[in-house]
Curated annotation (Swiss-Prot):
Source species: Bacillus subtilis (strain 168)
Upper lineage: Bacteria, Bacillati, Bacillota, Bacilli, Bacillales
GO CC term, one of those recorded: cytoplasm
Pathway assigned in UniProt: Antibiotic biosynthesis; bacilysin biosynthesis
Cellular localisation: Cytoplasm
Gene: bacA
Protein's name according to its UniProt entry: Prephenate decarboxylase
Induction: The compound guanosine 5'-diphosphate 3'-diphosphate (ppGpp) is essential for the transcription of the bacABCDEF operon and BacG, and GTP regulates the transcription of both this operon and ywfH via the CodY-mediated regulation system.
The UniProt record lists the keyword Cytoplasm: yes
Function: Part of the bacABCDEF operon responsible for the biosynthesis of the nonribosomally synthesized dipeptide antibiotic bacilysin, composed of L-alanine and L-anticapsin. Bacilysin is an irreversible inactivator of the glutaminase domain of glucosamine synthetase. BacA is an unusual prephenate decarboxylase that avoids the typical aromatization of the cyclohexadienol ring of prephenate.
Length: 204
């Protein structure tokens, strides 16, 4: 659902109809951001007849730097990301659209051969992206320790590699890295912002 529709063809962007546009967001594969970006491409860019591709990055800040390089580069950021507030303030960025796309299911994932017990939450370190960590508080009532990483997919990968035993991650990353959910929480209702290059250079 598009809440704000300032079509990405506006403000001198009519060339995007014939050229390839890039939608940037947080990677690696398996992130909720990738899921939302694919949703956006399927439900907006393709319906508008736009040629588009998806590009995944290590941080949202890296996505923004790419967006600032070209009017054909865009960035999708979830409103749960704390750093999004800085993007709204930048004169060289513009907010183009806001849309809703709920995340995949979130839960605690382990390797298939790992024997999980509930009391491990009192002592183990859970690897997670910062944004969803309150799921642990609300669903388990536990005060756990976290190792914070850049994405939910990266959290799952670290468990797959044996660096940690428990990840707070989503269903896509769980499948990608062959993990098993020992607890499931919820699909998070989420809204997202689409940013494009601003017109600050044209005004100066």
């Amino acid at each position: 659902m598009i809440i704000l529709d300032n079509s990405i063809q506006t403000k001198k962007r009519t060339d995007s109809l014939s050229k390839l546009i890039t939608v940037n967001t947080l990677g690696p594969e398996g992130t909720s951001s990738e899921y939302a970006a694919k949703h956006f491409i399927s439900n907006f860019t393709l319906l508008q007849g736009l040629n588009s591709k998806l590009s995944l990055h290590d941080t949202f800040e890296s996505c923004i730097e790419r967006t600032l390089q070209s009017p054909l580069e865009y960035t999708i950021v979830p409103h749960a990301y704390d750093g999004i507030k800085h993007f709204y303030m930048r004169p060289d960025l513009q907010l183009l659209q806001i849309f809703r796309c709920d995340t995949p299911m979130y839960g605690l994932a382990v390797r298939p051969d790992f024997e999980f017990r509930d009391d491990m939450l009192d002592t183990s370190v859970i690897v997670s992206h910062p944004s969803p960590i309150n799921l642990i508080k609300y669903f388990t009532r536990k005060d756990v320790r976290f190792k914070l990483v850049n994405s939910t997919s990266q959290a799952a990968r670290k468990v797959k590699e044996g660096l940690y035993d428990i990840a707070l991650t989503n269903e896509l990353a769980r499948q990608k890295y062959g993990l098993t959910f020992v607890k499931t929480f919820k699909s998070i209702p989420m809204s997202w912002s689409l940013f494009g290059k601003g017109d600050v250079d044209d005004e100066n």
